[in-house]
Amino acid sequence: MSSGRIVQIIGAVIDVEFNRTDVPQVYDALVVDGTDTTLEVQQQLGDGVVRTIAMGSTEGLKRGLPVTNTGAPITVPVGEATLGRIMDVLGRPIDEQGPVNSEDKWSIHRQAPSYDEQANSTDLLETGIKVIDLLCPFAKGGKVGLFGGAGVGKTVNMMELINNIALKHSGLSVFAGVGERTREGNDFYHEMQEAGVVDVENFTNSKVAMVYGQMNEPPGNRLRVALTGLTMAEYFRDQKDENGKGKDVLLFVDNIYRYTLAGTEVSALLGRMPSAVGYQPTLAEEMGVLQERITSTQTGSITSIQAVYVPADDLTDPSPATTFAHLDATVVLSRDIASQGIYPAIDPLDSTSRQLDPLVIGEEHYNVARGVQEVLQRYKELKDIIAILGMDELSEDDKMVVYRARKIQRFLSQPFHVAEVFTGAPGKYVTLRETISSFRDILDGKYDNLPEQAFYMAGGIDEVVAKAEKMKSAA
């Protein structure tokens, strides 16, 4: 193992000088002697000098300090020992529950599976959330993005999906907290304990591994923590059981935008010219390296659900725009819908899914989904006429479209289990079968006689009918 010394420190970026014959390779991990600071080599500048990013705080470091090359990339513990534990970017435990006793350690930099290893699946993943199951269904082994600006409900939707899928899913989950709030990470950990997904008494009963690099941490941690979580998920996917099969793994990433942002923070310090809106010129490549590894193989699958922050609600911003290309389903959260008090604030016209195909989901589901979108789109077009001339100027057919669209809009709202503590309303899980039949009946005019208020924040259609009866008797 070669050793060198620090020659320059600028924030999170540190230059280290080695003998010309012992220059470390790109992505090699270096350790600053006498500290627990790890550096990752990013560039070779020539003359034996390498430029690195610190995985942790650079406070207390100074020029001349000795640095040792480990001769290998950053490796993290993988396997059963990670379940129930909270780890940092280097796989070190941060939950004060003792060391992570893992026999295997994998490098966080790995090749994506080759074309012949990959497998695609058309099996649907039921979420119990009406608007998602109907209009942007998820595929098992697919990649899903939750897009939204600040405060429209990305994390709440993510937590509800974890509640509805991970708790009912018999496989394993990995949660990567990338540059998000520590409070949310703490809440998530305690919720998982209450749900029995994390068993502190006996970690072998746990079903989820957690990797956190929160927003108070240096950019190096936030840049690599998504890769750490992904590596742990890949291990579960690729480890074969006695039948030669891997596991079906759920990977939750909150928030993929912070991964991009961490790259932006260090990009200028690494001497790269910024591109559009100040992002790093390597934005598409960095995103591709991460996303191409999140895939399903012949052995097992990774189903990934990623929250994506949208700066200033601009979906054309380079960061969310780059993410769009990699996803199978996009769930777009809208501030306009949130301002109407309709939650989840998912835009039914902007959200898309590759699964929305009659060959995959069946004719009935496809026709109902397109029928709902058609009614909502027509209502959107009529809104301007209503604002100028009023409802009376519309034809009878258009009036009927407006009444049905308003009922559909309200019926797309739903009380969440994770929001029970705030709203006091018990959460509802609605099966796909019930969702399709309910919306088909609304489109067919079966519930034209019910007031639109009855459709708001209801689970199934039976609840709507009961609410309408209650309103009638109260009136």
Curated annotation (Swiss-Prot):
It is found in: Cell inner membrane. PROSITE patterns: ATPASE_ALPHA_BETA. Gene3D superfamilies: 2.40.10.170, Bovine Mitochondrial F1-atpase, Atp Synthase Beta Chain, Chain D, domain 3 (1.10.1140.10), P-loop containing nucleotide triphosphate hydrolases (3.40.50.300). It catalyses: ATP + H2O + 4 H(+)(in) = ADP + phosphate + 5 H(+)(out). One of its GO terms (molecular function) is ATP hydrolysis activity. Keywords: ATP synthesis, ATP-binding, Cell inner membrane, Cell membrane, CF(1), Hydrogen ion transport, Ion transport, Membrane, Nucleotide-binding, Translocase, Transport. CDD domains: ATP-synt_F1_beta_C (cd18110), ATP-synt_F1_beta_N (cd18115), F1-ATPase_beta_CD (cd01133). ATP binds at G148, G149, A150, G151, V152, G153, K154, T155. The keyword Transcription regulation does not apply. Its EC number is 7.1.2.2. It comes from the Bacteria. The keyword Translocase applies. InterPro entries: AAA+_ATPase, ATP-synt_VA_C, ATP_synth_F1_bsu, ATPase_a/bsu_AS, ATPase_alpha/beta_chains, ATPase_F1/V1/A1_a/bsu_N, ATPase_F1/V1/A1_a/bsu_N_sf, ATPase_F1/V1/A1_a/bsu_nucl-bd. One of its GO terms (cellular component) is proton-transporting ATP synthase complex. SMART domains: AAA. It is a peripheral membrane protein. It is an enzyme of class 7 (translocase). F-type ATPases have 2 components, CF(1) - the catalytic core - and CF(0) - the membrane proton channel. CF(1) has five subunits: alpha(3), beta(3), gamma(1), delta(1), epsilon(1). CF(0) has three main subunits: a(1), b(2) and c(9-12). The alpha and beta chains form an alternating ring which encloses part of the gamma chain. CF(1) is attached to CF(0) by a central stalk formed by the gamma and epsilon chains, while a peripheral stalk is formed by the delta and b chains. Belongs to the ATPase alpha/beta chains family. NCBIfam families: atpD. Produces ATP from ADP in the presence of a proton gradient across the membrane. The catalytic sites are hosted primarily by the beta subunits. PANTHER family: ATP SYNTHASE (PTHR15184), ATP SYNTHASE SUBUNIT BETA, MITOCHONDRIAL (PTHR15184:SF71). This is ATP synthase subunit beta. It comes from Psychrobacter sp. (strain PRwf-1). The gene is atpD.
